């Protein structure tokens, strides 16, 4: 349907990844293996935290929510990517595109918020150990997680509604493997000033401020451990915080890389590669980082396996 030189767009074409045809099958198998690893790894953490009573602590409540967020974050984009890699016409409906955008932002925002909360949890545990159980009570932590989900849903809904009000002309080709908000803005023939303004303002609240809060938490932790009497205590703190710092580096490093690295003619390829890092690679590595460097997780896995063997 046309009018005023505009076309009602019913679907978009996702060009996906610039993969040569001879490597298409290889990359399909690679992405499928990565997605299955994401599902199994993050489900394992969720199940362990649920089944093992020794992990019923704030730190692991946040970790299980992070694993759930990682699992859903990848599931928003990966199934459609795999489907389109096997399709002659890699399309997504207009409604499906907005739905994908909404949930992508929900789970992406949630990961950013949870990393802040986990940093705060470590800060309280190390700097105020005697008051830890009082400050990080079960009720407080559950309420905090619920609040974070509400904030992320509200933020994602705002951007989705702002995109929904835009008009899209004849161009419907998205140079990405999912409905990225920046790619959609490039296709719009409407005034996108409000959209860009909200991205800059709220982007700082969702990305910059959480990152600064994490840095502040670890600065306080660093100065606190300088007062520790023994090397063993310092090593224990570093081993406890090391997993979280690794995840923070992976997540924020790739996101900042999109905006801080100089853009050239291959800026679209760079954005796609970076997006693949924080939507696929990071969620895949997180379970390994937390399980391989965490004694509690290893012991919980052994206890659950032994319990199942005894019950059989």
Curated annotation (Swiss-Prot):
Topological domains annotated Cytoplasmic: 50-57, 121-139, 220-236, 293-312
Residues spanning the membrane: 26-49, 58-79, 101-120, 140-158, 197-219, 237-260, 273-292
Disulfide bond residue pairs: 97-189
Compartmental location: Cell membrane
Membrane topology (Extracellular): 1-25, 80-100, 159-196, 261-272
GO CC, one annotated term: plasma membrane
Membrane topology value: Multi-pass membrane protein
Keywords for the protein's UniProt record, in alphabetical order: Cell membrane, Disulfide bond, G-protein coupled receptor, Glycoprotein, Membrane, Olfaction, Receptor, Sensory transduction, Transducer, Transmembrane, Transmembrane helix
Family: Belongs to the G-protein coupled receptor 1 family.
Stated name of the protein: Olfactory receptor 1500
């Amino acid at each position: 349907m046309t009018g005023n030189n505009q076309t009602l767009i019913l679907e978009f074409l996702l060009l996906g990844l610039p993969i040569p045809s001879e490597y298409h099958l290889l990359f399909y198998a690679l992405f499928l293996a990565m997605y299955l690893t994401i599902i199994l790894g993050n489900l394992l953490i969720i199940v362990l935290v649920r089944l093992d009573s020794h992990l019923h602590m704030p730190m692991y409540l946040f970790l299980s929510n992070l694993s759930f967020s990682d699992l859903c974050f990848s599931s928003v984009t990966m199934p459609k990517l795999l489907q389109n890699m096997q399709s002659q016409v890699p399309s997504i409906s207009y409604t499906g595109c907005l739905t994908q955008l909404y949930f992508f932002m929900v789970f992406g925002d949630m990961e950013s918020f949870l990393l802040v909360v986990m940093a705060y949890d470590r800060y309280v545990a190390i700097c105020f150990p005697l008051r830890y159980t009082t400050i990080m009570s079960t009720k407080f932590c559950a309420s905090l997680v619920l609040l974070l989900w509400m904030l992320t849903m509200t933020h994602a809904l705002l951007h989705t509604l702002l995109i929904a009000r835009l008009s899209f002309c004849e161009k419907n080709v998205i140079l990405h493997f999912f409905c990225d908000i920046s790619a959609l803005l490039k296709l719009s023939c409407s005034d996108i000033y409000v959209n860009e303004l909200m991205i800059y303002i709220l982007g700082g609240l969702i990305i910059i401020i959480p990152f600064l809060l994490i840095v502040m938490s670890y600065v306080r932790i660093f100065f606190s451990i300088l007062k520790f009497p023994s090397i063993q205590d310092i090593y224990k703190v570093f081993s406890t915080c090391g997993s979280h710092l690794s995840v923070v580096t992976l997540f924020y490093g790739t996101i900042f890389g999109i905006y801080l690295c100089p853009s050239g003619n291959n800026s679209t390829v760079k954005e796609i590669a970076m997006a693949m890092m924080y939507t696929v690679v990071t969620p895949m590595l997180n379970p390994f980082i937390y399980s391989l460097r965490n004694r509690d997780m290893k012991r919980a896995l052994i206890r659950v396996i032994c319990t199942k063997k005894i019950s059989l």
